[in-house]
A protein has these predicted regions:
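N-terminal intrinsically disordered, cationic/polar leader segments
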Residues: 2-76, 80-95
Length: 95
């Protein structure tokens, strides 16, 4: 019986490979949904409402916002995302 080799662990940092043509998307609203397997973050842009849209919103109790992008991440990714957001928020708040 031969000894099985342990998988070699490699530590590395992932850096975004910035592509100057990659679109930058602005959003000021995020809706979140999840399944047992992933989280979906739907980013929208809410613009100031016209008088007509205000009346519709008052009647329907709904404001429609255009979806700019949807991002789906695995459940295992979410704790790291939360930790990164909290750290960046702490640095932002302390400055």
């Amino acid at each position: 019986m031969s000894d099985q080799q342990q998988p070699k662990q490699i530590n590395f940092t992932i850096l975004p490979d910035e592509d100057s043509t990659a679109p930058r998307t602005y959003a000021n609203f995020c809706s979140i949904a999840h399944t047992p397997f992933d989280f979906t973050l739907t980013f929208c842009e809410v613009m100031p409402l016209s008088d007509k849209e205000i009346k519709e919103a008052e009647a329907e109790h709904v404001v429609r916002a255009p979806v700019r992008t949807k991002i789906v991440v695995p459940v295992q990714f979410v704790p790291n995302l939360i930790a990164a957001l909290q750290e960046h928020w702490r640095v932002f708040s302390d400055s």
